[in-house]
Amino acid sequence: MSDLSAQKRLAADVLDVGENRVWFDPDAQSEIADAITREDIRELVADGTIDAEDTQGNSRGRARERDAKESYGHKKGAGSRKGKAGARQNEKREYVAGIRAQRQQLRELRDDGTLSPAQYREMYNMANGGEFDSVRRLTNYVEENYGDS
């Protein structure tokens, strides 16, 4: 096997890649050894005898494994947390999601006749004031106070 370092250097320049990314066809060593000009190298590139290998990317295998574990609640303990609680879960978004769900539930109860418009307005204002932590608490309150009517 002959020394092809000069050809590798020329090929790297022609292909505009680093020398480590230059690939030579193992079956065409003698043909490559005869190529001594840039034009010769360009012809071999056109033939497919010399090519540039793809760049090495970062493997996402470990990231996928970690994401899978986090999706079912692992790796989320106190030692893994860096931001404050409000940075990890936005308090405003949490509030907005909760109040929208409660208001939707109140609308449904009003529309199906469980609540009168006056009761609906009273409950709406209570929800707005933070009286209910969740839709479940709101539903329990309705059942306890307005369930008979």
Swiss-Prot record:
Superkingdom: Archaea
UniProt GO molecular function: large ribosomal subunit rRNA binding; RNA binding; structural constituent of ribosome
Basic residues bias spans: 74-85
Disulfide bonds: none
Basic and acidic residues compositional bias, start-end: 62-73
Residue span of region Disordered: 45-94
Record key words, sorted: Ribonucleoprotein, Ribosomal protein, RNA-binding, rRNA-binding
rRNA-binding is among the record's keywords: yes
rRNA-binding recorded as keyword: yes
Similarity-based family: Belongs to the eukaryotic ribosomal protein eL19 family.
Subunit structure as annotated in this protein's UniProt entry: Part of the 50S ribosomal subunit.
Protein name listed in UniProt: Large ribosomal subunit protein eL19
Organism of this sequence: Halobacterium salinarum (strain ATCC 700922 / JCM 11081 / NRC-1)
Classification lineage: Archaea, Methanobacteriati, Methanobacteriota, Stenosarchaea group, Halobacteria
